[in-house]
Amino acid sequence: MSRPKICASIVNDDLEAIKGVAPLVDLYEVRIDLIGFEWRELTGQLPKPWIACNRKPEEGGMWPGGERERIAELLAALELGAEIIDVELSTQGLADILARVKKRAKCLISYHDMKETPSIDVMKEIMQRQLAAGADICKVVTTAQKFEDNVSTLQLIREFPENRVVSFAMGPLGLISRVLCPLVGGEFIYAAIAAGQEAASGQITANELRKIYSMVRE
């Protein structure tokens, strides 16, 4: 089994901690909405490829400005060397944004349900919309209200074996889906750089995840 990929979510400008987890992770997620305007300087010092993300409040983000400014700040990452740009499926003008992104980077189209986990049929329809829009990577993240929600998000990955998918459930009840996502075929899983620096509810640290994966491989 190949080494499960971990993406470390950067939520502040603690460069020492960011570089400290580099041996454990495969890429970084730069959370522009959480870091603030210092994010630009930080990206030039990252030792691994990175995803640019400027999450909208409706999907769990903290961007304080307007939508036009949010997208402009996100697309600035193209000039700074982002390998992947995360754009929400619900973003207005998605086609035009993707056309700009695809000239320079891969596009991850994301969907977040902050309240519950839809049925597998609804999640499959969301995935189809992401693929039809031109996603290089599809991300479908829900909120676990019961243990079975973990199974649904992981099943979604198995339903699309030819595509690059990230799917898991947030919250305390969704922990197992985070761990298992890359083990059942998910493209990667997000992790916190350190305890207390979680980008979303239920996020595990990169160190904890790598310890688990090393035991699985033994």
What do the predicted segments below correspond to?
Residues 60-63, 117-122, 198-204:
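Short, charged, surface-exposed secondary-structure boundary motifs
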Residues 9-11, 27-37, 74-76, 80-94, ...:
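Catalytic beta/alpha-barrel core
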Residues 158-218:
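C-terminal alpha-helical cap/extension of soluble enzyme domains
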Residues 122-130:
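Anionic-ligand binding region
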Residues 33-48, 89-104, 118-122, 145-158, ...:
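Active-site-adjacent beta->alpha loops and helix N-cap segments on the catalytic face
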